[in-house]
Amino acid sequence: MRCPSCNSLDTQVKDSRPTEDSSVIRRRRVCVTCNFRFTTFERVQLRELTVIKRNGRRVPFDRDKLMRSVQISLRKRSVDPERVEKMVSAIVRELESGGESEVSSEAIGEIVMEHLRDLDDVAYVRFASVYRNFREAKDFEAVLGELSAEDETPRLAPVRK
């Protein structure tokens, strides 16, 4: 692994451990050349995904870009970062297990919105406003109406014994 400080390829792993859900390996590394310490994360990648943008351009899927867009929608919201990480991992697993090597940006946006709806209503509305390119207040009203309708949908009470 190349050192982010001095670009040396001579680094050593000092500590390696799985995350709580064992989906990621966290490694603490140190550069032998400059003694810079840094952390890397290793994840399973089921397949190489290509994103088909709205303009037809194809770009490699970027998990970090997905994480950044979710974090922007969650800015100043009190959501546990671990829940965000689990949500993004679930989205990536869903995309990778879909059987297709190419996925549209629209499909990714819809999946993200499904997950955000369960995580945080405000983040859902923020993400929807960018993803759906809101232009007027009525666009926000429509999404808020969707959330209200979902909240009013009767849910079955749990069966108690």
Swiss-Prot record:
GO MF term (any one): DNA binding
Record flagged with keyword Transcription regulation: yes
InterPro entries: ATP-cone_dom, NrdR-like_N, RNR_NrdR-like
UniProt zinc finger (unnamed) residues: 3-34
Superkingdom in the source lineage: Bacteria
UniProt family annotation: Belongs to the NrdR family.
The protein's name: Transcriptional repressor NrdR
